[in-house]
């Protein structure tokens, strides 16, 4: 068994290596090829990664083999040999390289009581003395100068990682070098998941939410928080209270450390939660009165049903049936909406015989705001219809009085509106669980609205009909992020987001 230190898995009773505790002491130097999720990766020759854990005031560092992988792997993902035996788990990465943790090459195991440890990239051509690096002549003069001082107790260790050689130096309080170890191997340092956020500024809550989501979905990391205001800790805690839904009390761990001018939010996730940390799912459902965005657990339930059923079949056509006056059930409203949708013309001020329902939404807007409102509202409204039972959107019918108002535009502007609608519908992401993988089916009409006595008109009601979709329709990509191999935050696509759900 292997337990990631990033997830709180350190156990002093088990074998400990950089990044993991395990029930077996596996010599990872003997492997030339490894497998992750049945994909094979070659161990990089003559190049290593210096990895370390700092747990319970103990430092565990070593040069480890690494393999190249252009896909994003999660901390804790199992690593196997070619016979299918698990030999380690994913722990550290540098760009598109991942470490293979276990018994590695040169190592350093320290008690950190009273001493510090620092890591540096050793620049090509530089020499090292104690805690500084520079060109050789400068370092030589530095060493001569410090030799005159008496050595004192060691207070710091410095690990220097270079392309051709690695070194460990120790220094006393004056910076005098007390000890040096030299490893004739080239290595790299893993990229830490570190994000910097300023609070007390515009969009600070959004930036903080994005950072938390990305780090929790990438095994953990640290957010360095600064603020123009004096009480950075107070401002931070207020922001964290407003977005507490982003982390799970059961699965995620979050710790705030206060500094003088900044705070640090350390976090890691056990990856046992069925869902990724998500700010917004952008999955909508239609209710009688509104288009509601599903939260993560509602989305899990909805997507689980689609996965289990392999998608949905088209809805059967409505049966013809004469309803007595005044009946307002869902089917009668839908039938009236269908008749209204097929009208060739309308009269300004006429009353519509049906209101909003699970299948119908009315909205009115001025011609000036028409394209803006379509851009802002169309994706959520139409995707909610597609995810529920299908439905009708009528733009130009007053939501309160249910009277026809319309909007007045020229022919060229109408073409732009029609093009906008087509563009926004075609951009709606669909995640399929079925074999047919059909597109969203819809129809759009502009129904002319006449005033009494007018023979011509430039006033219209826009009528859009959307059928129930076979699978899940998103209004946009989910607002859920991860740290990529370059250390940048990337948003999951809908397909990627769904693929990470533990159904």
UniProtKB/Swiss-Prot annotation:
<feature type="active site" description="Proton donor">
    <location>
        <position position="15"/>
    </location>
</feature>
<dbReference type="GO" id="GO:0061507">
    <property type="term" value="F:2',3'-cyclic GMP-AMP binding"/>
</dbReference>
<feature type="active site" description="Proton acceptor; shared with catalytic histidine of dimeric partner">
    <location>
        <position position="140"/>
    </location>
</feature>
<dbReference type="InterPro" id="IPR038461">
    <property type="entry name" value="Schlafen_AlbA_2_dom_sf"/>
</dbReference>
<feature type="site" description="Substrate binding">
    <location>
        <position position="103"/>
    </location>
</feature>
<keyword id="KW-0244">Early protein</keyword>
<comment type="similarity">
    <text>In the N-terminal section; belongs to the poxin family.</text>
</comment>
<dbReference type="InterPro" id="IPR029684">
    <property type="entry name" value="Schlafen"/>
</dbReference>
<feature type="site" description="Substrate binding">
    <location>
        <position position="184"/>
    </location>
</feature>
<protein>
    <recommendedName>
        <fullName>Poxin-Schlafen</fullName>
    </recommendedName>
</protein>
<keyword id="KW-0540">Nuclease</keyword>
<dbReference type="Pfam" id="PF04326">
    <property type="entry name" value="SLFN_AlbA_2"/>
</dbReference>
<keyword id="KW-0378">Hydrolase</keyword>
<comment type="function">
    <text>Nuclease that is responsible for viral evasion of host cGAS-STING innate immunity. Cleaves 2',3'-cGAMP which is produced by host cGAS following recognition of cytosolic DNA and blocks the subsequent 2',3'-cGAMP-mediated activation of TMEM173/STING, which normally spreads to adjacent cells and activates the interferon and NF-kappa-B immune responses.</text>
</comment>
<feature type="site" description="Substrate binding">
    <location>
        <position position="182"/>
    </location>
</feature>
<comment type="similarity">
    <text>In the C-terminal section; belongs to the Schlafen protein family. Subgroup poxviridae B3 subfamily.</text>
</comment>
<dbReference type="GO" id="GO:0052170">
    <property type="term" value="P:symbiont-mediated suppression of host innate immune response"/>
</dbReference>
<dbReference type="InterPro" id="IPR006853">
    <property type="entry name" value="Poxin_vir"/>
</dbReference>
<feature type="active site" description="Shared with catalytic histidine of dimeric partner">
    <location>
        <position position="136"/>
    </location>
</feature>
<feature type="site" description="Substrate binding">
    <location>
        <position position="147"/>
    </location>
</feature>
<comment type="subunit">
    <text>Homodimer.</text>
</comment>
<dbReference type="InterPro" id="IPR007421">
    <property type="entry name" value="Schlafen_AlbA_2_dom"/>
</dbReference>
<dbReference type="Pfam" id="PF17057">
    <property type="entry name" value="B3R"/>
</dbReference>
<feature type="site" description="Substrate binding">
    <location>
        <position position="180"/>
    </location>
</feature>
<dbReference type="GO" id="GO:0004518">
    <property type="term" value="F:nuclease activity"/>
</dbReference>
<dbReference type="InterPro" id="IPR031450">
    <property type="entry name" value="Poxin-SLFN/SLFN_N"/>
</dbReference>
<feature type="site" description="Substrate binding">
    <location>
        <position position="58"/>
    </location>
</feature>
<feature type="site" description="Substrate binding">
    <location>
        <position position="167"/>
    </location>
</feature>
């Amino acid at each position: 068994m292997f337990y990631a230190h990033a997830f709180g898995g350190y156990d002093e009773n088990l074998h400990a290596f950089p990044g993991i505790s395990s029930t077996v002491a596996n010599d990872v130097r003997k492997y030339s090829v490894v497998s992750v999720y049945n994909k094979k990766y070659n161990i990089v020759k003559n190049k290593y990664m210096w990895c370390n854990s700092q747990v319970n005031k103990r430092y565990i560092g070593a040069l480890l083999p690494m393999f190249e992988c252009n896909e994003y792997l999660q901390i804790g993902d199992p690593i196997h040999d070619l016979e299918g035996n698990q030999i380690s788990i994913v722990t550290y990465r540098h760009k598109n390289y991942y470490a293979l943790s276990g018994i590695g090459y040169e190592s350093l195991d320290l008690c950190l009581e009273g001493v510090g440890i620092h890591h540096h990239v050793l620049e090509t051509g530089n020499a090292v003395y104690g805690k500084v690096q520079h060109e050789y002549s400068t370092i030589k003069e530095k060493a001569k100068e410090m030799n005159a001082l008496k050595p004192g107790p060691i207070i710091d260790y410095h690990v220097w990682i270079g392309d051709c050689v690695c070194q460990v130096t120790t220094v006393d309080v004056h910076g005098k070098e007390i000890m040096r170890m030299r490893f004739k191997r080239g290595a790299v340092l893993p990229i830490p998941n570190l994000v910097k956020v300023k609070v007390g500024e515009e969009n600070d809550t959004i930036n903080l939410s994005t950072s938390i989501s990305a780090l929790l979905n990438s095994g953990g990391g640290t957010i360095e928080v600064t603020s123009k205001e004096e009480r950075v800790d107070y401002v931070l805690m207020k922001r964290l209270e407003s977005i507490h839904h982003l982390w799970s009390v059961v699965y995620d761990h979050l710790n705030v450390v206060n500094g003088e001018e900044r705070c640090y939010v350390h976090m890691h996730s056990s990856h046992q939660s069925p869902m990724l940390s998500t700010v917004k799912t952008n999955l909508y459902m239609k209710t009688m009165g509104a288009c509601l965005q599903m939260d993560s657990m509602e989305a899990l339930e909805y997507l689980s049903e689609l996965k289990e059923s392999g998608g949905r079949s088209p809805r059967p056509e409505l049966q013809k049936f004469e309803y007595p006056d005044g009946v307002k059930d869902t089917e009668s409203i839908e039938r009236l909406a269908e008749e209204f949708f097929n009208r060739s013309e309308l009269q300004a001020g006429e009353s519509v015989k049906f209101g909003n329902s699970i299948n119908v939404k009315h909205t009115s807007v001025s011609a000036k705001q028409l394209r803006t409102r379509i851009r802002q509202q169309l994706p959520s409204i139409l995707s909610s219809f597609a995810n529920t039972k299908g439905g009708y959107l009528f733009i130009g019918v007053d939501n309160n009085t249910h009277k026809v108002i319309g909007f007045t535009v020229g022919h060229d502007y109408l073409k732009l509106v029609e093009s906008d609608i087509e563009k926004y519908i075609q951009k709606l992401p669909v995640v399929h669980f079925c074999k047919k993988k059909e597109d969203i089916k819809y129809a759009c009409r502009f129904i002319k609205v006449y005033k009494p006595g007018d023979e011509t008109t430039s006033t219209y009601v826009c009528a859009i009909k959307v059928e129930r979709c076979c699978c899940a329709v998103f209004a946009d990509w989910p607002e859920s992020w991860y740290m990529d191999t370059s250390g940048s935050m990337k948003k999951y696509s809908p397909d990627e987001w769904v693929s990470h759900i533990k159904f």
